[in-house]
């Protein structure tokens, strides 16, 4: 069983919700990325999303864009990110998911990317800009290598939600609002209604992300979904810290606090 499937089943049996933090690989460094993931695992994260930095991340707001730019400037590339994941997997069984833009993996080679991701211990892939017409070809490869292709839906038309949610595996990444990632802007979507709509088209677990800033919002939305995804708030903590020790302390405390709100 894929680690993602096992984790959601385990949490469902316990009546708990998944905490899914996002970080950018290589911000502030690849070595620190390893230690951040291990610390988040220790403090209660259930699944970790690892963003592969991209020069023009259309779905991301300024916080994650800045993180991508810092990681690229620091030398983070797909090849050395794969090695970073291998190091994490050598010390942890936590489910790991890549968030990666389509053009990055297209240039690298679709099958090469997915085969290498599977080999180093990645359990799922989210491609925010994946054209629907390309999904079938990629899904054939992800199935071959036992990696989930996680669909990403937004509060748009019912037909579009149905089309996207019906294809994919692992869980559905439910974007809480139209636009880009980031905290500070009020979520205007009726989350209960939106989650019920997505749930009417798929039996996959539903994880809610974009704009969730911490434990109070996680607590507010947890009745309607199976997991909460938090990215920009964590990236912002990392950016404001001086040195790895402070990063690990503050990110670890944040994860502990949010995890408590989901229990």
From Swiss-Prot:
List its EC numbers.
4.2.1.20
Molecular function per GO: tryptophan synthase activity
The record's listing under InterPro entries reads: Aldolase_TIM, RibuloseP-bd_barrel, Trp_synthase_alpha_AS, Trp_synthase_suA
**Pfam families to which the protein is assigned, alphabetical:** Trp_syntA
Q: Which GO terms describe its cellular component?
A: cytosol
Its UniProt pathway annotation is:
Amino-acid biosynthesis; L-tryptophan biosynthesis; L-tryptophan from chorismate: step 5/5
Q: Which residues form the active site?
A: 49, 60
* Keyword match Nucleotidyltransferase: no
Sorted alphabetically, the keyword list is: Amino-acid biosynthesis, Aromatic amino acid biosynthesis, Lyase, Tryptophan biosynthesis
Question: What quaternary arrangement does the UniProt entry report?
Answer: Tetramer of two alpha and two beta chains.
Q: Which family does it belong to?
A: Belongs to the TrpA family.
This molecule's function is given as: The alpha subunit is responsible for the aldol cleavage of indoleglycerol phosphate to indole and glyceraldehyde 3-phosphate.
Q: What is this protein called?
A: Tryptophan synthase alpha chain
What species was this sequence derived from? Clostridium kluyveri (strain ATCC 8527 / DSM 555 / NBRC 12016 / NCIMB 10680 / K1)
The gene it comes from is trpA
């Amino acid at each position: 069983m894929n680690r993602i499937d096992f984790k959601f089943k385990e949490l469902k049996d316990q009546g708990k919700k998944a905490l899914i933090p996002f970080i950018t690989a290589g911000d502030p460094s690849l070595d620190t990325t390893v230690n951040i993931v291990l610390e988040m695992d220790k403090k209660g994260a259930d699944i970790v999303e690892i963003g592969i930095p991209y020069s023009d991340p259309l779905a991301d707001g300024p916080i994650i864009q800045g993180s991508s730019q810092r990681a690229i400037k620091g030398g983070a590339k797909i090849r050395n990110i794969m090695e970073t994941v291998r190091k994490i997997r050598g010390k942890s069984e936590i489910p790991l998911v890549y968030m990666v833009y389509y053009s990055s993996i297209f240039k690298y080679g679709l099958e090469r990317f997915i085969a290498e991701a599977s080999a180093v211990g990645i359990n799922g892939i989210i491609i925010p800009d994946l054209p629907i017409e390309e999904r079938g070809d990629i899904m054939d490869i992800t199935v071959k290598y036992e990696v989930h292709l996680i669909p990403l839906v937004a509060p748009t038309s019912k037909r579009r939600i149905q089309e996207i949610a019906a294809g994919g595996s692992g869980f559905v990444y439910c974007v809480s609002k139209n636009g880009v990632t980031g905290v500070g802007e009020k979520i205007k979507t009726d989350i209960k209604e939106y989650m019920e709509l997505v749930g009417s088209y798929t039996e996959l677990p539903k994880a809610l992300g974009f704009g969730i800033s911490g434990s109070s919002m996680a607590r507010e939305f947890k009745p309607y979904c199976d997991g909460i995804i938090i990215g920009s708030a964590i990236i912002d903590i990392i950016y404001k810290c001086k040195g790895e020790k402070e990063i690990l302390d503050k990110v670890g405390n944040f994860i502990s606090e949010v995890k408590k709100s989901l229990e």
